[in-house]
């Protein structure tokens, strides 16, 4: 938004994000369109006031619904009717969970609704969601559809989204390394506390068992883990 949004969008949405009051999401994939973004079906219908009404579903949305912030700002890829086919017809929209009034206060609930939770291995501190846009749970402004606001130029949404994803990719890689390192620390702690077997050549069956960290092959595997993540 700092790179492609208007001054009004920055003041309305970015500043509260930097203050920690608003959170954000990236809404790209859909149930029928994962990495094949040319096949997305979410549509954005233009309104007389310059806003848009969005209708569709978005899948695999991290932090798509929670109560940790005052508001959630969804950045949504969608197609305006009559847009070119494929990725050349994708636009980017701001779709807040709660509409923001001109004075910065929160207004009525937008028609963005949690439809389901996706359970992903390794992620326990954040929700991963399926979101419905414009399916009628709420009617902001007494009209159907989730209210959205165009970011940048129509049909250039994918370029805007990739601008953000370049930085997000670094975060994903860092998260993977941290998960791997946490796994190593848990494995090391377990190996130090789990007794099993004795030294090769030990003859006395009454001697105490060794913690498995003293077994050569376990030490080899722990060293491999440590070398990967460090």
Functional labels for PLM-detected ranges:
Residues 21-23, 39-41, 49, 71-73, ...:
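Active-site lining segments that contact anionic ligands and/or coordinate catalytic metals
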Residues 1, 25-27, 55-61, 71, ...:
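Glycine- and acidic
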Residues 32-35, 65-67, 84, 120-127:
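Short Gly/Pro-enriched turn/cap motifs at secondary-structure boundaries
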Residues 4-5, 9, 19-20, 36-37, ...:
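Alpha-helical interface subdomain recognition
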Residues 26-29, 47, 54-57, 62, ...:
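Generic beta-strand/beta-sheet core signal
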Residues 1-46, 71:
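Long, structured ligand/cofactor-binding scaffold of large enzymes
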Residues 60, 99-115, 120, 127-168, ...:
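A glycine-rich, basic-preceded beta-loop-alpha segment at the flavin cofactor/substrate interface
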Residues 51, 55-109:
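A short core secondary-structure module
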